[in-house]
Amino acid sequence: MRFNHFSIVDKNFDEQLAELDQLGFRWSVFWDEKKILKDFLIQSPTDMTVLQANTELDVIEFLKSSIELDWEIFWNITLQLLDFVPNFDFEIGKATEFAKKLNLPQRDVEMTTETIISAFYYLLCSRRKSGMILVEHWVSEGLLPLDNHYHFFNDKSLATFDSSLLEREVVWVESPVDTEQKGKNDLIKIQIIRPKSTEKLPVVITASPYHLGINEKANDLALHEMNVDLEKKDSHKIHVQGKLPQKRPSETKELPIVDKAPYRFTHGWTYSLNDYFLTRGFASIYVAGVGTRGSNGFQTSGDYQQIYSMTAVIDWLNGRTRAYTSRKKTHEIKATWANGKVAMTGKSYLGTMAYGAATTGVDGLEVILAEAGISSWYNYYRENGLVRSPGGFPGEDLDVLAALTYSRNLDGADYLKGNDEYEKRLAEMTTALDRKSGDYNQFWHDRNYLINSDQVRADVLIVHGLQDWNVTPEQAYNFWQALPEGHAKHAFLHRGAHIYMNSWQSIDFSETINAYFSAKLLDRDLNLNLPPVILQENSKEQVWSAVSKFGGDDQLKLPLGKTAVSFAQFDNHYDDESFKKYSKDFNVFKKDLFENKANEAVIDLELPSELTINGPIELEIRLKLNDSKGLLSAQILDFGPKKRLEDKARVKDFKVLDRGRNFMLDDLVELPLVESPYQLVTKGFTNLQNKDLLTVSDLKADEWFTLKFELQPTIYHLEKADKLRVILYSTDFEHTVRDNRKVTYEIDLSQSKLIIPIESVKK
């Protein structure tokens, strides 16, 4: 077990004394060390009679004895406060060594009154075995009263807002869009959860088109057939133009203003990180946007009309637009309780909305926490001129997602009045997204947030899994690279798949975000010394490192051929039995592919030295095929048996994370380190007619040509003599159309190479 503390803010001694005093630890520098220890235990919500001090004495006996307090006894006692069991988790008498292995904050200094006070200060900032830092655990146990006012320790807001007194309101915000072209602004239903307090509250918004319901039956009926041939395309240039939808002015009709919303709600999905912030004085707002249950409009899926329906909430919180107590618009309601400062959170589609909102530059949005978000929808459903399904969802496309999230149809009255128009607009979307060619076009350009990255004013916090093949790492990498130089940005890059990371044992993620949000949303100084990239190492359990950048400056070129003349070939076609088997379950195909049992060319490369891949590997391939259309797929494995992190978190302890005071208890989880035969490092796909994003070229059969394309970016450490397995093939049964024509591909390995971006990791 190893803790990684990124939330701890260094404080001078006077600041430490003042903050300890506010918690009730009022000590004099003239007290001796044992008296400070005794008072610390008396004031804390813990039973010191159960604590062991050394191999012979419990704490009560030790405090009565003449034995001096030293660092070994200090750690014997305090490790128990951090939930570690003496004689089982650690050996009494070797506690200092154990604390060092845990990576707990400690200094090798002489014990004095001042150094022990500092030690207790940083102990309160330290992570417990069960996943909370000590001060937050003790506050949840009653160290401070629930007075519905802000209290801070080490620059983090504490859970002193009463979760039993939460206001739950529903209002309808007027958006600046008319997605159905009815001549009136779409109204957007939002759900507000806020502490009852006289304080002006900041808001954490989660914009989730899933939030008010999904239509799974409509989704399943809309899925596209994958067992189709690849289309041949005529050569041409693609032209797009940057344009944003026109914003409609707010209505000006005067209405009576009320200060209480009549509509309430009792239950619904909430993000546990938002729950954590609720009890620390941050209101939560959930908004699903246009085309969702209780709102107006069509589900435009990813364009700026949808984004504007989300940012309208920020406008309302800052008095720039109106909200109503019902869809009838008879009474207006104002956010008099809000301070106007907003953060956005959420994973996947939710993180996507945060990216999009940030690129509007909306005033009041101070910071986004975009977790596994999409920065360009083309790169989610397409790749290099190729229809490419997100991992795990073959046949899905943006019109399918629209059918899933157009939840207005779940209400019968809305279905009666709006389904015909919805069906018409959905058909228009299906045509516009152009599955036939797979090319970039104006439809996708309108859903590309990267082109407006220069408008971002909010601080950007990115979370992304480097084993996420649903929303691939390029979505985070491209947004990171697109931000103007010097923009405030940080990335948490973990080894998981498409998962949240706010309840992991190894890292104080929630507390780090607390320090950041407390500064940005409550007008406090941001003293957090956060590195640009916080990286989970790929070959060690519970180890996180600080990295200076996402994308290396140097390159390593590895030739694919081992001799001057070296060729490989593979066929595209499968027999009927294999084709049906792989089409039925793409996981069977993946297993065979990784074990060299599919139609593929396999090249094993032993590394000449230790290296860290940092960024997208570029594949330069010399090839020919006996057809005038084709696709190329590539995957690279870290191949060979060794211990690696799994991509899904396992529960280490159930319901031990208290998000407030006995509020929304959460499981403690972690990625386990397990023996495995290989691990996927990166992959990529391309249509051979698309040499670049905006150019479609003719492909001549039986003629050699050179192709370059980038694979998914990663940061991945490899030791000398580790083996990279490069797999080249055509049809991928998880991602691409299942083209089963009889085509043979030939690769000139002697003229092909990997171009690997490398960057050493800062330790």
From Swiss-Prot:
Intracellular or extracellular location(s): Cytoplasm
Q: Where is the signal peptide?
A: none
GO terms for cellular component:
cytoplasm
Cross-referenced SUPFAM superfamilies = alpha/beta-Hydrolases (SSF53474), Galactose-binding domain-like (SSF49785), X-Prolyl dipeptidyl aminopeptidase PepX, N-terminal domain (SSF81761)
By its UniProt entry, which InterPro entries does this protein fall under? AB_hydrolase_fold, Galactose-bd-like_sf, Pept_S15_Xpro, PepX_N_dom, PepX_N_dom_sf, Xaa-Pro-like_dom, Xaa-Pro_dipept_C, Xaa-Pro_dipeptidyl-ppase/CocE
Q: Catalyzes what? A: Hydrolyzes Xaa-Pro-|- bonds to release unblocked, N-terminal dipeptides from substrates including Ala-Pro-|-p-nitroanilide and (sequentially) Tyr-Pro-|-Phe-Pro-|-Gly-Pro-|-Ile
A biological-process GO annotation: proteolysis
Group of enzyme by EC: hydrolase
EC number(s) per UniProt?
A: 3.4.14.11
Could you tell me the keywords of this UniProt record?
Aminopeptidase, Cytoplasm, Hydrolase, Protease, Serine protease
Name the active site residues.
Answer: 348 (charge relay system), 468 (charge relay system), 498 (charge relay system)
**Known partners and oligomeric status:** Homodimer.
Stated role: Removes N-terminal dipeptides sequentially from polypeptides having unsubstituted N-termini provided that the penultimate residue is proline.
Q: Identify its protein family.
A: Belongs to the peptidase S15 family.
UniProt cross-references to HAMAP family, sorted A to Z: Aminopeptidase_S15 (MF_00698)
Q: What is this protein called?
A: Xaa-Pro dipeptidyl-peptidase
Q: Which organism is it from?
A: Lactococcus lactis subsp. lactis (strain IL1403)
